[in-house]
A protein has these predicted regions:
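N-terminal presequence-like segments and the immediate start of the first folded domain
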Residues: 1-56, 60-73, 79-133
Length: 133
């Protein structure tokens, strides 16, 4: 099975030895994204600003791979403070178009950032290349 790493200019920089995303077949697996800019600085002070930053990072990575954030089939959410769930839920419903992805939301009080999201996106098939002689 082929695996292709995706590097997305403009998304938050990986904080360790991992890729923004990896494409395997027609699926794109996006690593956990926090509310950081491309220099690694925390974006915003409110939960709403953090939400926008995290979803924007997912969208940047999806586009860099040739995909679309609205093709997410699975979304994992990790919330430092679970009292933010309703705001997260409402924002997701506004940012993404139906049909909405399968989703898991887990409270992680020791996360150290307000929210982290990871995602799996269904990608358009790659163009088939003719065999070389």
């Amino acid at each position: 099975m082929d695996r292709t790493a995706v590097v997305a200019d403009g998304a938050s920089k990986p904080a360790g030895p991992y890729s923004h995303a990896v494409r395997s077949g027609d699926l794109l697996f996006i690593s956990g994204q926090g509310p950081f800019d491309n220099q690694g600085a925390l974006v915003g002070t409110t939960f709403a600003e953090h939400l926008r930053s995290v979803f924007d990072n997912l969208a940047i990575i999806a586009r860099a791979a040739g995909g679309d954030i609205n093709d997410i089939v699975r979304l994992g959410a990790y919330l430092e403070d679970y009292s933010n769930f309703q705001e997260y839920n409402a924002f997701m419903g506004e940012y993404l178009r139906p049909p909405y992805p399968a989703r898991t939301t887990i409270p992680v009080p020791t996360l150290g950032i307000p929210i982290e999201l990871d995602a799996v996106i269904a990608m358009p098939p790659r163009a088939t290349q003719p065999p070389t002689a």
